[in-house]
Amino acid sequence: MTTNEAGRPSRRGPYAKSTERRHAILGAAHAVFAARGYRGGSLQDVADLVGMSQTSLLHYFPSKSDLLLAVLNWRDSNTGDGTTPPDPEEALVDAVIRQARFNEEIPGVIELYTVLCAESVTDGHPGREFFTERFERLRRSYTRRFTQLAEEGRLRPGVQPEAAAASLIALWDGIQTQWLLSPDSVDMAGCLRGYLELVILPE
């Protein structure tokens, strides 16, 4: 129930209820896929978590692969896809550290990414194209940032922008896995900062 301008309670329309249900399904699928992966998690697991039938769930998402892609896009809409900092003038180091710390604060977001990214290399995985395109966007984005630093004379001698970009992404994914296994022993933001300080000259 909601309240209209006259103070009288009014019922929410079907669109609002449908949107709420979709968000509930996405949240449940996020939890299931993060814990069990795409292949290990089932539509019934998601439906049970939401408290609805699998048939009703399929009304919102026609297939399991549709649900997976919706969850991945939902994740990026909540956390950012890493390619467009909110402030284009934000320094690369600051943008990376901010994103890493932000991701740590959202329950399950790193688990979901790590599990599904690893699964996506297998044949026939519906997330393969998503992750392939995502890595291509990330490499292009970070290559542009490192190229800009090189033009400003701030990239250390011998460091190539393309290699620095690919290495940053590889480190980030790898350190996330270590952090998931031992969160109290791994300083994710500190490791990323350390790498960037190795390749970027101070101002």
Task: Describe each model-derived feature in a short phrase.
Residues 124-136, 151-197:
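Hydrophobic/aromatic-rich alpha-helical bundle segments in the mid-to-C-terminal region
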Residues 73-79:
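Short, basic, alpha-helical segments at the C-terminal edge of helix-turn-helix-like DNA-binding modules
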Residues 97-104, 112-122, 198-199:
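Helix-loop "lid/cap" segments that line or gate small-molecule binding pockets
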Residues 54, 65, 76, 169-176:
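Conserved acidic functional residues
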Residues 84-89, 94, 106-108, 125-152:
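Amphipathic alpha-helical packing segments from all-alpha helical-bundle domains
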Residues 1-20:
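N-terminal intrinsically disordered/low-complexity leader segments
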Residues 21-24, 28-70:
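Helix-turn-helix
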Residues 70, 81-110, 161-168:
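Hydrophobic alpha-helical connector segments
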